[in-house]
Amino acid sequence: MPGEFSRRDFLQTSGAALAAAGSSSLANHSNAIDEPFAARQERRRKELWGLLGDLPWNHRPEPPRLVSREDHDGYVLERLVLDLNGQEPVPAVLLIPKKRAERAPGLLFIHWHAGMYDLGKEQLVRGVKAQPAYAPVLAEKGIVTLAIDSWCFGERKHEQDGGQGEQDAFKLMLWRGQVLYGMMMFDEFRAMDYLAGRPEVDASRLGAFGMSMGSTKAWWLAALDPRVKVCMDVCCLTDYEELIRTHALKDHGIYYYVPALLKHFQTADINELIVPRAHLSVNGRRDPLTPPAGVEKIRDRLMPLYREYGKEEDCRIELFDCEHVELPEMRKVILEWMDRELVG
């Protein structure tokens, strides 16, 4: 991205053009979708981006810095520092399978919150009790996978008290006209730019995947960026009104709250921007973060749209008998979905 670019120039010459004007990309993805629906998605996608505060669209990223390369069983792990936003460097890990296609599918693995501010991107390799590590599985499937530290997490945790650091970041950004969640999503979007540009990656096969906070960010990213051909989210397809009704606002971190969002969007409205691309969502029926009635409401809104465009098999929204955890049977569904929609 050369020279002194205006925001308009930037949008025309980078991946942001796809996210800001996604109808053309979506039309290319599926001839089944009609033009009025695609045009509405384009308009609403721009509106959704507009709620995320002042974003550094004009920032010209510096080249990534390779910190180290680690040899693991079945994959090489590159440790990187990416320049995504111009405000602070973003540590990242890139998993490159040793056995893969010349142009392999790419996946953005988005870490969770759970108050584990020291974990961040390392969740990909280490896993957590509620979700065992995905690195070996993704390596076996030949999926090139990128994970970054979100604002306030991992190597971007700047306060000893991580929760206080998150609150301070939220408040300071509000003063500056920014939104913490907006800056988080901008980083994930820019990370997708980097992943799509890697020589190992087939940019026509890109996915987003995460649990909890990572789940929320996965479906938001798929809504904001039509390059995401496969969205997989675990334990956080949360209907906002149902969250209010069940008095569960306290269960989500401060990062989650976007000013004025409910004046313009409900959860189903955001997820409608993913149609007709592949979307898998698995959730716990006993998870207070994701009230089951809300999951069912979203499913009942989306499934008729997928059915209308002949893509019913490309949307699956399920509830399992569990709390905030990925069950083995949920993982089985996820891996089958990866094989069919991303690898195959």
Residue ranges of each PLM-predicted region?
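N-terminal cap/lid segment of alpha/beta-hydrolase-fold proteins
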Residues: 60-100
